[in-house]
């Protein structure tokens, strides 16, 4: 459904007037993207006023030379305008700005256009995404952005479509399905346009799909080519000769094709017009567990690889695999940056990536040759990368027979949040984290087409007993999950500086001008740093966590910085303990834009109310235990361990009396489908739903008791003691990591 501002009437005459008004607005500020073609995309670096494509330029450096805002005056940055988006889900997008109009996406792949000067809404289109597909989302109902070409903007939708919209009006030009809806595919990544073709990948490898990237004609929506990243059923013809070669790196006894094999291209791409090479990042296996997926071993190409293709045909050129035979969800879908670096006295055309596995890679982007690799965060799965073979020298990291405590966790040393490259400093700025996990074999694994199929017993480590104090869970969890903005020298392969972000789940980075780097934090601030020293120069309270990536642009000669504000995503959904739900209250997601001297004020935040009285706790211990297990199997990925959700999702410890009464209608009947909560009637029965409800009721009573005594001396002492335990836990984690590294 499309809406125009300021009026939503559907009468034809008024609709025509609104269309004319929107078109006139676009013409007044530019051409609404009608002139964006191959030449303009290639020359995007010279258009300092605009942010035409996802990484601003085709090399994905996310650097803007705009310098009106500088280290000398950034402290004068203030809010110019904001736009409430009416959502409390994660906002991961990078806006585009073309000729005075800003385009961006929100939750459920909703598309928006606003006046980049004032924030006035020009149009919005919710694209009618099937809300039932929400059950297939590993990592929230997010979207990371758009692409633009010849008067159209392109959006990949959560339910697997690629949609072209008229940039001036938001009307659908064409709409094509890119996935098999019988499989749990989703799309959250931003498309790219190269040589008149729209490129889009997909996600879903946690549940079980086969990955690929597709190219569509930008004018007609017809598919031009498709490149599968992993082989299919070996008894059937291979789609290309390279897949026949890749198939020998898989063990067919694992019947990987039944689950899917994985290898989704769910985020990063880059393009070099001189070499005419498209680079795609390939994800993890389906299932994660390589001993289930490919029992005899093998590299399992092209999982966790950077692959170079010809953009006109999809022809394979080269690949580099960062994690051969990945068994830990160490994807190589993370942001890739192209640059020319002076290495050993020679200028090398390189591609750089900091994938999940914790190593920073510098490759020759023409050939795929590995030039250097060093760990940018603590790793324990491998000692180093052998520069002769290009392969990791692995430690004893097998969890086939016994659990392994390992760095990084599946959240990675770096996830989808884009890094940026500053050509002035020569440094890359990485939204990094250090977080470990216990990897253990799922001894009872059986493929379930409606649920996660990772082949690891993740639930055992996420399950929180009903009796355990949630404040202790939160403090220990937060203390052992570190996040920071890391300045990295890609030539010397060493850390320059880091700044603690206080949470491991933050925004992408923006490099700007001579000396600035911007990053938003999960604690609810937008920060600016000195790019050379790491000194924080500006610290602005945006009222909730930031995971969207900031951009900068100018209109009428005035520079702005914009960012989408709304916490969520994979970590934000699953690990509510990383944010204090009382001190980080829920607010609606917003688009926020800053300029020098901006004086707009955000409305005050309403603090959460006290916990309502839960219904009577009459369940048996057997019911509570059953509910605990079921909750941590089916509910934990969205609602968090022990019911501790992040601030912007339903915290099930705080259910109202009405929600308690409607529990079965919500869980089994889909009463909250439009808000992203699908019906689980095909997964749970009434008895199981009642057990989950009983467990959450018990948790609610314990939370209420804690709330009622939170101002007491005993509570203060207890929380102090929990803080000490959390510090000890953090120290213990680091000692384990150190000893494991020393032993390796």
Pin down the residues of each PLM region.
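Gly/Gly-Pro-rich "capping" loops immediately C-terminal to redox-active cysteine motifs
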Residues: 628, 640-673, 678-679
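C-terminal capping alpha-helices of c-type cytochrome domains
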Residues: 156, 623, 661, 681-738
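Repeat-blade elements of multi-bladed beta-propeller folds
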Residues: 51-55, 90-110, 135-161, 186-207, ...
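Electrostatic cytochrome c docking/interface patches
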Residues: 38-39, 606-630
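Blade-level signature of beta-propeller repeat domains, shared across WD40, Kelch, NHL, RCC1
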Residues: 436, 551-608
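Extracytoplasmic beta-rich repeat domains
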Residues: 83-94, 124-147, 175-190, 228-268, ...
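Blade/loop signatures of beta-propeller domains
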Residues: 30-79, 234-244, 391-394, 473-475, ...
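Short, conserved, GDST-rich strand-edge loop motifs in beta-rich repeat architectures
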Residues: 200-212, 253, 280-300, 434-478, ...
């Amino acid at each position: 459904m499309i809406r125009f501002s300021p009026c939503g009437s559907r009468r034809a005459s008024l609709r025509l007037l609104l269309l004319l008004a929107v078109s006139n607005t676009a013409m007044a500020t530019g051409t609404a993207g009608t002139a964006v073609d191959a030449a303009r995309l290639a020359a995007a670096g010279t258009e300092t006023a605009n942010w035409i494509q996802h990484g601003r330029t085709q090399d994905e450096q996310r650097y803007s030379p705009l310098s009106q805002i500088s280290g000398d005056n950034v402290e004068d940055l203030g809010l110019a305008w904001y736009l409430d988006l009416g959502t409390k889900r994660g906002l991961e997008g990078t806006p585009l700005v073309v000729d005075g109009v800003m385009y961006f996406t929100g939750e459920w792949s909703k598309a928006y256009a606003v006046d980049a000067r004032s924030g006035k809404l020009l149009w919005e289109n919710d694209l009618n995404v099937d809300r039932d597909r929400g059950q297939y989302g590993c990592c929230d109902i997010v979207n990371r952005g758009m692409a633009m070409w010849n008067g159209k903007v392109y959006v990949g939708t959560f339910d697997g479509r690629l949609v072209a919209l008229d940039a001036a009006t938001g009307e659908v030009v064409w709409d094509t399905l890119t996935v098999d809806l019988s499989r749990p595919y989703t799309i959250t990544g931003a498309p790219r346009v190269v040589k008149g073709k729209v490129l889009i990948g997909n996600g879903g490898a946690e549940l079980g799909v086969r990955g690929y990237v597709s190219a569509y004609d930008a004018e007609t929506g017809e598919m031009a080519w498709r490149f599968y990243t992993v082989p299919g059923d070996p008894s059937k013809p291979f789609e290309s000769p390279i897949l026949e070669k890749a198939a020998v790196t898989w063990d067919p006894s694992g019947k990987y094709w039944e689950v899917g094999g994985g290898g989704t291209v769910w985020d990063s791409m880059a393009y070099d017009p001189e070499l005419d090479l498209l680079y795609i990042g390939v994800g993890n296996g389906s299932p994660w567990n390589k001993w289930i997926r490919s029992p005899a071993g093998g590299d399992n190409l092209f999982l966790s690889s950077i692959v170079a293709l010809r953009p006109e045909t999809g022809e394979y050129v080269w690949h580099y695999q960062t994690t051969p035979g990945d068994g830990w969800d160490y994807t190589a879908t993370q942001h890739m940056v192209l640059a020319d670096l002076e290495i050993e006295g020679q200028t090398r055309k390189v591609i750089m990536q900091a994938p999940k596995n914790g190593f920073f890679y510098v490759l020759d982007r023409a050939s795929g040759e590995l030039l250097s690799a060093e760990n940018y965060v603590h790793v324990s799965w491998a000692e180093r990368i052998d520069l002769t073979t290009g392969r990791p020298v692995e430690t004893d990291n097998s969890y086939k027979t016994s659990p392994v405590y390992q760095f990084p966790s599946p959240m990675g040393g770096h996830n989808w949040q884009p890094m940026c490259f500053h050509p002035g400093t020569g440094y890359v700025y990485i939204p990094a984290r250090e977080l470990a996990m216990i990897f253990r074999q799922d001894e009872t694994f059986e493929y379930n087409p409606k649920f996660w199929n990772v082949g690891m017993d993740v639930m055992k480590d996420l399950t929180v007993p009903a009796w355990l104090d949630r404040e202790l869970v939160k403090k220990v969890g937060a203390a052992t999950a570190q996040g920071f903005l890391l300045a990295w020298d890609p030539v010397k392969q060493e850390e320059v500086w880091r700044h603690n972000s206080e949470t491991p789940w933050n925004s992408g980075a923006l490099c700007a001008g001579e000396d600035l780097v911007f990053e938003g934090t999960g604690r609810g601030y937008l920060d600016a740093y000195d790019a050379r020293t790491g000194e924080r120069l500006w610290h602005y309270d945006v009222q909730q966590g930031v995971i969207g990536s900031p951009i900068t642009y100018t209109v009428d000669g005035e520079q702005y910085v914009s960012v989408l504000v709304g916490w969520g995503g994979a970590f934000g959904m699953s690990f509510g303990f990383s944010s204090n739900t009382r001190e980080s209250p829920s607010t609606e997601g917003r688009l926020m834009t800053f300029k020098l001297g901006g004086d707009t004020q955000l409305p005050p935040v309403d603090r959460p109310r006290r916990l309502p009285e839960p219904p009577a706790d009459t369940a048996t211990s057997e019911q509570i235990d059953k509910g605990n297990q079921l909750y941590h199997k089916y509910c934990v990925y969205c609602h968090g361990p022990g019911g501790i959700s992040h601030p912007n999702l339903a915290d099930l410890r705080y259910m109202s009396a009405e929600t308690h009464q409607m529990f079965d209608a919500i869980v089994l009947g889909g009463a909250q489908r439009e808000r992203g909560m699908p019906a689980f009637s095909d997964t749970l029965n009434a008895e199981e739903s009642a057990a989950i409800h009983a467990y959450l009721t018990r948790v609610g009573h314990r939370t209420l008791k804690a709330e009622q005594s939170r101002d007491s001396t005993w509570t203060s002492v207890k929380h102090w003691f929990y803080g000490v335990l959390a510090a000890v836990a953090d120290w213990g984690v680091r000692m384990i990591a150190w000893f494991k590294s020393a032993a390796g």
